[in-house]
């Protein structure tokens, strides 16, 4: 943070995105991370964790709809039980609860302060999802929860902070962690994770894909442009193949499975998001790294 007026968000060791801040709504250094809620001049309200923009009012719906819906629509049967790791703003939960079939949505977040801030300041994100009777909010470490849970889920959504060295999240992008997730998935279930930026950390994006494909055998990758992130943003899905859904299938399943409005995602945007450009697709042939506990992947900044 530069004074109280600018956030200088480093994208790589060589470049940053400067965000003008109108005012700081709340700020606290918790035992896990530095959490700040602000009003950006361009993007409106926004959540910052450890100097990284997590989401803004301007375009959070793009990120959260592309994170959630390709996974849940590509499941053979409409999902009944969904596990969310991270997603403290409540927007991922909001999208999950739009499914008529969902009976239980378990959301696990390590930092109670993020939830507290979200409930107070980010209603536009959660829209009351924390109070939905289908919601089970658990404040604990995600890895600890996965090791101890006895339940199985139709879908698991990883809305985590980036794999930054010495952070709370980087071990949640490894082969060993994905193997633990596979054990608590119901048959024909699937997972999705945010997969960082093809613009600034293409090797990380591809490595996450490689790692998920190694564990789940089936995998696909999507991307979209996020203005508040200053570039492309990626998502990787495992155990399912949303990339094989046609435009018409997506639109039909939205009508069948979802109760509520979507602002970004439909059959057309689905097709575009899974149509990776040639320069990115070529890297999937070149990069073979798998992220493991002994050799994890990190974003460059």
UniProtKB/Swiss-Prot annotation:
Gene Ontology terms describing biological process: polyamine biosynthetic process; spermidine biosynthetic process
Q: What UniProt keywords are attached to this protein's entry?
A: Cytoplasm, Polyamine biosynthesis, Spermidine biosynthesis, Transferase
Enzyme Commission designation: 2.5.1.23, 2.5.1.126, 2.5.1.16, 2.5.1.79
Q: Summarize how pH affects activity.
A: Optimum pH is 7.5 with one-half of the maximal activity at pH 6 and 9.5.
Q: What class of enzyme is it?
A: transferase
Q: Which residues form the PABS domain?
A: 4-240
Q: Which GO terms describe its cellular component?
A: cytoplasm
Binding sites annotated in the UniProt record for S-methyl-5'-thioadenosine? 33, 109, 141-142
Q: Which PROSITE patterns match?
A: PABS_1, PABS_2
Q: Which residues bind spermidine?
A: 64, 89
What is the superkingdom listed in this entry's lineage? Answer: Archaea
Q: What is its main location?
A: cytoplasm
Similarity comment: Belongs to the spermidine/spermine synthase family.
* Entry protein name: Polyamine aminopropyltransferase
- Native organism is Saccharolobus solfataricus (strain ATCC 35092 / DSM 1617 / JCM 11322 / P2)
């Amino acid at each position: 943070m530069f004074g109280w007026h600018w956030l200088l968000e480093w994208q790589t060791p060589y470049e940053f995105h400067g965000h003008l801040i109108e005012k700081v709504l709340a700020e606290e250094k918790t035992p896990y991370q530095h959490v700040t809620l602000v009003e950006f001049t361009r993007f409106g309200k926004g959540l910052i964790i450890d100097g990284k923009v997590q989401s803004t009012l301007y375009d959070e719906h793009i990120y959260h709809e592309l994170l959630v819906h390709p996974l849940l629509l590509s499941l053979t049967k409409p999902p009944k039980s969904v596990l969310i790791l991270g997603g403290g703003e409540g927007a991922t939960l909001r999208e999950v609860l739009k499914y008529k079939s969902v009976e239980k949505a378990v959301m696990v977040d390590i930092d109670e302060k993020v939830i507290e801030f979200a409930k107070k300041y980010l209603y536009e994100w959660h829209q009351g999802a924390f109070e939905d009777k289908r919601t089970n909010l658990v404040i604990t470490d995600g890895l600890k929860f996965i090791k101890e849970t006895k339940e199985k889920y139709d879908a698991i959504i990883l809305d985590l902070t980036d794999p930054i060295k010495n952070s709370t999240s980087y071990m949640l992008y490894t082969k060993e962690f994905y193997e633990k997730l596979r054990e608590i998935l119901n048959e024909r279930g699937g997972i999705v994770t945010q997969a960082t930026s093809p613009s600034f950390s293409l090797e990380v994006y591809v490595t996450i894909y490689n790692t998920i494909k190694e564990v789940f055998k089936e995998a696909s990758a999507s991307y979209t442009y996020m203005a508040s992130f200053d570039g492309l943003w990626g998502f990787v899905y495992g155990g399912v193949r949303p990339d094989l859904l046609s435009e018409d299938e997506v639109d039909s399943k939205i009508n069948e499975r979802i109760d509520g409005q979507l602002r970004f995602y439909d059959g057309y945007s689905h097709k575009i998001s899974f149509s990776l450009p040639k320069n990115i697709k070529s890297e999937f042939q070149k990069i073979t790294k798998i992220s493991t506990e002994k050799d994890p992947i990190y974003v460059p900044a």
